[in-house]
Each structure stands twice: as C-alpha cells, then as structure tokens.
C-alpha cells in the first residue's frame, strides 16, 4: 500500500481528502483520492447471521444488532455456525443495499474516516439503474452524512487510470465482462456490450475440469492436518469437525481455490483453439489444500479459451446460445456499432482492466483477434503490467479524478440533495 498523504480538496473553504469507494462483485476497494492504491480491499461477499445467532447485550441498539448480524472482512472468512454467505451484487450492480452499506461502513471505520468532513466518490457501471443511483446517494448523504458526493462511471475511471480521455474499456470482472466506449470522458451507451462470460464463468470451467479428473476440492478451513505426499499420490488428511457450517460458506471457500488456480495456472493461447490446433502449454504443478499436487498442461489453455468462445464450452444440463459473444468479439462488435468518426480512436485506445483480465496471454490474444477482424484500423491495447493496477483500475481512476481541482464543480452537495431532492439530481441533472 502507498504511504503518500491523500491529496486535499478544497471544500467549504477547507482542504479535505476525497474518499473513493469502488464496489465490485468480488471485492470492494476504499481509500483516499490522490493515492496510488486503495487503503483497504475487502471481500464484497459477506456473511449473514440468523437473528438467533447474533450475540449482543440486553441494551444493545438496533444499529449494533444490525452490524453484528453482518460479517464483513476477515470475520466473513470464519466458519461460523449458520452463517450464510451473501453476494450483494447481481449482474454487476447492487441488489442488496443493506449488505453493501454495512461493507461501506465497516471499511470507512477501518480507515477512521470522519465521513462528515470528506466528499465521497462512488463508482458505478454504465448499466446501473436510476433506483440504484438514488439509493447510493441516499446512503452517502443520509447515513454517512458526507458533505458532497459524485457517481463516476467505472469505464470512465478506468480510462483515466490509463491516462486516456478516449478509450474502449474492456473490463473483465468476476460476474460481468463489459466493453464500453468512452469519448472525451463520456460513455457512449448504445454501442456498449456486456456478458456473463467473465471470471466466475472461468472458475466454473476450471471446476468442471478438476472434478472430471477426480480431484478433491476440500477447502483449507475443513482440513485439520495433512501429510506430505509425492506428486500424483492420493492426499492424506484429516477433516475438522465443524457443525452447522453452511453450504454457501463452503462454496465461497472452494471458489478461493478456483481463483488461485486461475491466477497461477490458466493461460490463453495466442490463436483460437480448434480441433486441429490444440495449443501447447508447458506443464505446471498445482498443489491443492489437501496436499495433493499434479501437473496441468492442455487444460490450462482449454479452460481459458471459453472466455473467447463460450458457446463451445457448455456445462452439463445448460445451453450456451450460439449468439454468445467472447471477449474479442464484443470488442469488435462495439467498435463496429460506434459512429464511424470515433472507430479509429477506440481501436487505437483499447484499455484492458479487471482481475479477470490477468489470465496469462489474454491481452495479447485480444490484440491479435481484433487486429485480424479490423484490418483497416490501427489496433493498440493498453493493459497495466502491474497486477494491482489492473485489479483496481476503476478505483485508481476515481482517485485521479477525485484529486483534480477542476473536478470540484461536478460534486453534488448535501445542500443540493436536501433542497432539490434525489430524483431531480439523478434524473435531470448529473447522473442520468
């Protein structure tokens, strides 16, 4: 984490640091504008205790009970009895505001931030709903009591993080992969594309392969002890006795294994895989929490190929429509659907961001595919080599924007909120 001081903003005659929150499907990033990386990154997936399992004093307030009911941060990774794991976002937008508000409040408390003195910048996807915009501002002004707030499109923020006012942003998140054109800092909505074939989808492909090979995916929290075994030998381990741990918690911990595999093992072939071109990948060894280890070669490529040709990698009992578009196809579709006057700008400024984009070879493959499909345009891809910059692109862009003095005029003040109301601000003024 960076140790540089937050960049101050002049607000109400005083210099204060802007708070920036980027709420993603898997992780929420919180920090101060002007810094290089977020101060805090917490899981957006949080725990929910049943009312009868919430411990509290007799005189505990309803607010404290509500906070105890939700388990956020490290406590969400504890195998607590009867704790269900919530996924507060659906299709990349907030569906459970109680959970998200708890995540924000927990994170800001960890920062010891006095929200009454800091403007708050929040990121949002370009397909966010009007109702969600209103709710985000309501929490900012009514619950957190911030003096000013602003909702910035995550694609715009990612473009600014890459130093671009014009860009075509390919964001591969956990739930959603999206392609968004940005011209002069504004989103072009009509040509934008998104799909569900993103990080979580790749995790499912990985799980399908591992299960087909008979690999035990027992998560770490269930393992009491294990013995070292030779590569390829069956694991030898003892399970913990943990009564009343929910399936949703176990599923979350298994997903952590799949994410580790994805980050360290998966690779995108430089050309599309076909029956004639199976691709070659050097064998790599992966050790599972049980102690079992084995090598993976071709599977490292075939799982990742699903991001580019999802219709060819269906799951049992499910049908992927033939019209499902892969990452490169969405980029090409978006450029072709954009006004002819901006296509060259977009093709020459493709920004790739998001944790799901860190699969080895993904950026090169997108570049080659798009160059081949759009031979009349000069294609240039920008993808941060630093993993943290790629994972936190939208937050970093929000940090850049929040530290600009020229951005000050765009803030919505609490006074405006109180005098004109959220409906006016959302529908008619700033955030439509």
UniProtKB/Swiss-Prot annotation:
It is found in: Nucleus. The keyword DNA repair applies. CDD domains: ASKHA_NBD_Arp4_ACTL6-like (cd13395). Keywords: Activator, Chromatin regulator, DNA damage, DNA repair, Nucleus, Transcription, Transcription regulation. InterPro entries: Actin, Actin/actin-like_CS, ATPase_NBD. One of its GO terms (cellular component) is SWI/SNF complex. Its main location: nucleus. Component of the NuA4 histone acetyltransferase complex, of the INO80 chromatin remodeling complex, and of the SWR1 chromatin remodeling complex. Chromatin interaction component of the NuA4 histone acetyltransferase complex which is involved in transcriptional activation of selected genes principally by acetylation of nucleosomal histone H4 and H2A. The NuA4 complex is also involved in DNA repair. Is required for NuA4 complex integrity. Component of the SWR1 complex which mediates the ATP-dependent exchange of histone H2A for the H2A variant HZT1 leading to transcriptional regulation of selected genes by chromatin remodeling. Component of the INO80 complex which remodels chromatin by shifting nucleosomes and is involved in DNA repair. This is Actin-related protein 4. It comes from Yarrowia lipolytica (strain CLIB 122 / E 150).
